[in-house]
């Protein structure tokens, strides 16, 4: 089974992504990974770090001459700020009697962070892991970690492109109270235009409103959340299964997207809106079109009973406003127990545009795993043969003489 994990901290030396059981023969390059990481840095409302953050990519294993070789893939994303943090984030024990070490630890960066931020992992993490400050928690819970997931997912994207000829893309549905017209339905061909939008919106009208909302929040010392939609066209029927809860593709997608920092809700297709409809209005009727089984609509978002049904996959993720609010919220100092305001770290006003790119990454990883579970293969060529045979079967299964 395809597996992935990451290691590293926000201000550590580097982030590491590990990807296991990817078949041999999948094309991948540092340039392609860097391109996706660059997309992750996009977006109006991002903080100062995005202006100088350069993701230095190194492929440490699992790839030779531009192709995966079947062994575990290790990708390192270097941190350009590391020289400023070598003492504070040192993996080795430090000697605080050393003048240089003492100076670093008494600096602004080295200050103990004892005032947890509401909405962040700080408080629960300090208690759970018995830390006397929040630094060990916020370093790992930071959304900087998603850079490693985007790197790993670049391999999954290439695998999906080579095996199924599909692309994973996203756009921003809403930021704050601004949202696009629900009739807007972009395709992968629109991605360049979407990425050129400061807020990654497919609607110029909505874009202007979203930018206004972000500017207003920034002026007020506040932050904003929003909703992104990920779309994949051309998936085969039958990825995932109804057999058990953990096999359901929608459950896997929801778990993966909820695992992104600040994501608080996920819906497949029309999702929550379906709960407000009558049954006769909620489901996608099955018809024959040119002798082939087809659907009248796609309210289900391409998944029924935990399996892809041949329609476009549509999944949305709701991101809460960033927890590090410049206008600091009320908190408690965990040293003294006295009232305080939450610590303030450099952060974004709005990271919804970037969240779309991270959501793409998680969808790509889950889909790549589902493809390998369905079709297997130790090499790309073997997987493609298996898919081709299945596609021939499906053609005969859904074709009928008739209307």
From Swiss-Prot:
Database matches in InterPro entries: Chorismate_synth, Chorismate_synth_AroC_sf, Chorismate_synthase_CS
Which cellular component, as a GO term, is one annotated location? cytosol
Residues making up the signal peptide according to the UniProt record? none
Q: Which GO terms describe its biological process?
A: amino acid biosynthetic process; aromatic amino acid family biosynthetic process; chorismate biosynthetic process
Q: Which cofactor does it need?
A: FMNH2
- Known SUPFAM superfamilies for this protein? Chorismate synthase, AroC (SSF103263)
Asked if the Swiss-Prot or TrEMBL record annotates the protein with the keyword Flavoprotein, the reply is yes
Quote the cofactor binding remark.
Answer: Reduced FMN (FMNH(2)).
Domain of life, per UniProt, equals Bacteria
Which Pfam family is an annotated match for this chain, by its short name?
Answer: Chorismate_synt
- Alphabetized GO MF terms: chorismate synthase activity; FMN binding
Q: What class of enzyme is it?
A: lyase
The protein's job, in short, is:
This reaction introduces a second double bond into the aromatic ring system.
Subunit details for this protein?
Homotetramer.
Q: Which HAMAP family match?
A: Chorismate_synth
Task: Please report the name of this protein according to its UniProt entry.
Answer: Chorismate synthase
The organism's lineage is: Bacteria, Bacillati, Actinomycetota, Actinomycetes, Mycobacteriales
What gene name is given for the protein in this entry? aroC
């Amino acid at each position: 089974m395809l597996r992935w994990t990451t290691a590293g901290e926000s201000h550590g030396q580097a982030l590491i992504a590990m990807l296991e059981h990817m078949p041999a023969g999948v094309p991948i390059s540092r340039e392609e990974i860097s391109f996706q990481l660059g997309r992750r840095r996009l977006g109006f409302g991002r903080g100062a770090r995005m202006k100088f953050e350069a993701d230095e990519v190194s492929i440490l294993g699992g790839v030779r001459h531009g192709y995966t070789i079947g062994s575990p893939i290790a990708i390192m994303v270097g941190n350009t700020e590391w020289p400023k943090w070598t003492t504070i984030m040192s993996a080795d024990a430090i000697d605080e009697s050393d003048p240089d070490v003492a100076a670093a630890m008494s600096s602004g960066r080295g200050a103990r962070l004892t005032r947890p931020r509401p909405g962040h992992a700080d408080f629960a993490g300090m208690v759970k892991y018995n830390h006397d400050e929040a630094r060990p928690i916020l370093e790992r819970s930071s959304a900087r970690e998603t850079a490693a997931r985007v790197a790993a997912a670049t391999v999954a994207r290439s695998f999906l492109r080579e095996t199924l000829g599909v692309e994973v893309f996203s756009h921003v549905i809403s930021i704050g109270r601004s949202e696009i017209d629900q009739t807007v339905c972009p395709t992968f061909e629109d991605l360049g235009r979407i990425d050129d939008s400061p807020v990654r919106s497919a609607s110029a009208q909505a874009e202007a409103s979203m930018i206004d909302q972000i500017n207003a929040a920034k002026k007020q010392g506040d932050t904003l959340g929003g909703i992104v939609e990920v779309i994949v066209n051309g998936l085969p029927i039958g990825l995932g299964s109804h057999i058990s809860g953990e096999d359901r593709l929608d459950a896997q997608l929801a778990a993966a997207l909820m695992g992104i920092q600040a994501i608080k809700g996920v819906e497949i297709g029309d999702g929550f809106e379906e709960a407000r409809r009558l049954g006769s209005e909620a489901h996608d009727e099955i018809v024959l079109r040119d002798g082939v089984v087809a659907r009248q609509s796609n309210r289900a978002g391409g998944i029924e009973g935990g399996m892809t049904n041949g329609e476009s996959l549509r999944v949305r993720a709701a991101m809460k406003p960033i927890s590090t609010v410049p206008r600091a919220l009320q908190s408690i100092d965990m040293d003294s127990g006295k009232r305080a305001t939450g610590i303030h770290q450099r952060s974004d006003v709005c990271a919804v545009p970037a969240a779309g790119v991270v959501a793409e990454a998680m969808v790509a990883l889950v889909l790549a795993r589902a493809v390998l579970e369905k079709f297997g293969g130790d090499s790309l060529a073997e997987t493609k043969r298996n898919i081709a045979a299945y596609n021939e079967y499906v053609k005969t299964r859904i074709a009928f003489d008739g209307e």
